[in-house]
């Protein structure tokens, strides 16, 4: 089997983080358990659509914010990026059973609630929910970009301070 030469990443945890903030900001009454599943539901759809259309493209699950962003991906032919502190260390500590959760069907009631109550879930989940020109301004993408930019600027600042001490 040849490894993929092209990969794409779904920012599962950042997507959940954004939706949680959107629900709080807009006063959306939605179950925390439903929100907990949102990013994984989108990841499953993106994964399956891509595997059907372009089976050689690899999948990376990124932006993990909780253990579920790793454990719910078990069974997928995917690479998952996680932090050591708060994720990898907790997985080692809890040693949960290894169960293929990725191929479990999505609960239709959960999907319906997300599609009905969360506009940016619907936009990210539905085919053609956002257009290419809208992508850059899509809330979860902005959150990812802004988080990355902030962390990069902090790294540059730290490097500059350390060089100044030499």
Locate each region found by the language model.
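Catalytic alpha/beta core domains of metabolic enzymes, predominantly
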Residues: 1-101
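C-terminal extensions of enzymes
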Residues: 99-166
């Amino acid at each position: 089997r040849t490894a993929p030469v092209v990969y794409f990443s779904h920012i599962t945890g950042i997507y959940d983080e954004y939706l949680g903030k959107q629900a709080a900001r807009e006063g959306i009454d939605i179950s925390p358990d439903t929100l907990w599943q949102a990013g994984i539901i989108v990841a499953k759809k993106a994964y399956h659509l891509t595997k059907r259309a372009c089976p050689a493209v690899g999948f990376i699950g990124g932006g993990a914010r909780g253990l579920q962003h790793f454990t719910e991906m078990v069974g997928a032919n995917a690479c998952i990026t996680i932090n050591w502190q708060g994720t990898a260390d907790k997985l080692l500590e809890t040693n949960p059973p290894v169960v293929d959760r990725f191929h479990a069907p999505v609960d239709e009631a959960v999907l319906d609630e997300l599609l009905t109550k969360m506009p940016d879930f619907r936009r990210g989940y539905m085919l053609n929910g956002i257009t290419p020109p809208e992508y850059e301004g899509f809330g979860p993408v902005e959150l990812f970009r802004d988080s990355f930019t902030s962390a990069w600027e902090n790294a540059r600042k730290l490097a500059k301070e350390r060089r100044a001490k030499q």
